[in-house]
Amino acid sequence: MSVKPWDLLNPNSQFVVPEIAEKRYSICKECPEFIKATKQCKKCGCFMKFKTKLQAAECPIFKWKAEDPISNEEMEKIMTDNSATIFINIPSYKDPEIWKTVDNFIANAEFPDRIYFGITLHDENIDYNYQESIKRKNVQADCLIPGTIIGCQPARKNSHDKFYNNQDYYLNMDSHMRSIKNWDSEIIKAYNHAKNVYDIMVFTGYVPPYDVDTNGNDQIPDIDKNPTFFMSESNIKHFKNTLVPQFTPQYTNPDTDVLSPYVSGHFFFTEKEAIQKVPFSNDVAFTEEEPLMALRFFTAGINLVTPQKVFVYHRYGRPDRKLIWEEMPDKFYPQHNKSKSYFQNIIVKALNGSTDGLFDERSILDYEEYSGIRFSTGELEDRVVKGLPSGFIPD
């Protein structure tokens, strides 16, 4: 059984408080009309884990009833968590924007004292960067000679293992990013509202780009909705040749949050339970990082969602950017090839029933049905190529 996105996504939905939803769902689970395999009600056919969260919903055999609507002000209070801490994980390679990025996220936070940074920073200026890190509250950096760690994912794992201290929420991003005002409280509020629909999840996307003018001033675009994922011709060709999915952003101006087939390396936001359940890997370097994270989160039962609202901006196409594969090809490409082989081996083993490198709450075949990416045949469905929302949430 599956839940179609259009069954769920209503921006005007009113929800009950979590305690009432949990009480309703516990009643449903004890009811003889409850189908345990699909979490549906035989009487109404609804998926009860979602229906029990809706304010206007009621049990078809009257075991629980609709609740009075919650005011927008009360709902905002419920979804806001002003005591929460956020850990920001950043890998950086010779990036002159790293400290501007850190300062921007501190300055724009509503609660900067609750923001914690863990940075793996590759740059020859080790003493300078260390001094910059200790100038700032809650900022820790592992300052390394370039080439010490090869790849974004191993660098993220290094930051996590050294610096993460059980913060409530987790923002994984790059060293060339900017934020909206009060990004911390806004993203937590949006995440908790979306969680009513998707349960535990990852917010992710290829966020809009910003630029810097010749005077060093940030140029932030007037874009308030995140792009969604689609596959360009080069992305399609790459998948056909390697079985490694890649995506490109497209501006579809969605009216709601959108189920995603993919995880962005430069932006994902989640809660601590997700990152503790699905840790980073040392086995992928760069290209395979995003599809592996998507598969790992998905097979662990964690949903992938692109939020409608923009919270952060990204500057990938910088004119002065340094790339390890250009500066250290002898070090990078052996690891790159090893990474590709690792990903391909995981796919082959998963198609033969193994969960090595993945998790067992959902299968790779569930992911194929969800995303339209057919590893088993090497084909791509039109819906994933065109960037339509992923098809359903498997139970």
Predicted regions mapped to residue ranges:
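Cysteine-centered metal-binding/redox modules
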Residues: M1-K77
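Aromatic-residue-lined binding/catalytic grooves and analogous aromatic/hydrophobic interfacial grooves
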Residues: G387-F392
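Catalytic cores of eukaryotic secretory-pathway lumenal/extracellular enzymes that build
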Residues: I78-T377
